């Protein structure tokens, strides 16, 4: 069964709106094959009330992963995370292949890029969603993501340190396998 936009919002809203939560945005990017594009665009145009909504970037590809739902917003609705010329492709493919939660290196959020405040001060956690009954051969349905700023994470850690918990940060980038 497909996830309705209202169900996605109902799940995401408490995550983002908690007072002590560093999560800024949640999103779902739906996996599409070329024959599914027209139906997807028709549904998304009705949902967004934007008759001109399209995939970004345009063009023919073997598969697509456009931003479909988001909370509190989807600033670049329809952006294909599998597009060759976007910086998200490698980390999205990694999330799909690992079938585990993955985290980006420090990155600038799309929302900040649009507003002209493009600092690499955020992380995005991603989890691939699979369902053998509804999708292509490997069951891939899409990606769910949570975006949060580093300052928000640090404020959480600072808060917990007052309650007797302590953390140690270390640079472990040399341990990442590419």
Name the predicted role of every residue range.
Residues 2-178:
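Intrinsically disordered, low-complexity polar/acidic regions
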């Amino acid at each position: 069964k497909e996830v309705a936009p209202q169900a996605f919002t109902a799940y995401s809203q408490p995550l983002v709106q908690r007072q002590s939560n560093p999560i800024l945005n949640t999103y779902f990017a739906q996996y599409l094959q070329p024959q599914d594009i027209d139906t997807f665009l028709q549904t998304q145009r009705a949902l967004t009330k934007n008759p001109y909504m399209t995939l970004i970037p345009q063009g023919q590809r073997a598969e697509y992963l456009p931003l479909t739902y988001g909370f509190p917003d989807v600033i670049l609705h329809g952006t294909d995370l599998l597009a060759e010329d976007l910086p998200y492709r490698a980390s999205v493919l990694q999330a799909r292949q690992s079938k585990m939660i993955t985290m980006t290196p420090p990155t600038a959020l799309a929302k900040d890029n649009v507003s002209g405040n493009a600092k690499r001060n955020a992380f995005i956690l991603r989890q691939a969603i699979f369902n053998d009954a509804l999708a292509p051969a490997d069951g891939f349905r899409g990606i769910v993501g949570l975006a949060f700023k580093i300052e928000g994470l640090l404020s959480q850690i600072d808060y917990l340190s007052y309650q007797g918990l302590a953390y140690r940060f270390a640079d472990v980038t040399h341990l990442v396998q590419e």
